[in-house]
């Protein structure tokens, strides 16, 4: 009886540890897939930058003012710069 109880408790402990380890591994894999902090900061900054806005300075004579454009691996989508 004691041997069976010890075996059941040991099996339960191993199962709990295995489940916890599997969850931690899954979380670490999800973190590896995500972008590094430096890229996240760039995305946050660029997300706030509108790439297709009217000029801050009004037209001078016949010259059209230039609209801001995305560059460096970014493209304009829905009036916002997004990473290509």
Curated annotation (Swiss-Prot):
InterPro entries: Hwtx-2-like
Keywords: Disulfide bond, Neurotoxin, Postsynaptic neurotoxin, Secreted, Signal, Toxin
Similarity section: Belongs to the neurotoxin 12 (Hwtx-2) family. 02 (Hwtx-2) subfamily.
Propeptide regions on this chain: 23-47
GO molecular function: toxin activity
Signal peptide: 1-22
Function: Postsynaptic neurotoxin.
Listed name of the protein: U4-theraphotoxin-Hhn1a
Organism: Cyriopagopus hainanus
Record-level GO cellular component terms: extracellular region; host cell postsynaptic membrane
Disulfide-bonded cysteines: 51-65, 55-76, 70-81
The keyword Nucleus appears for this protein: no
Domain of life according to the entry: Eukaryota
Annotated localization: Secreted
Coiled coil: none
Tissues and organs where the protein is expressed, per its UniProt entry: Expressed by the venom gland.
Principal location listed in the UniProt entry: secreted
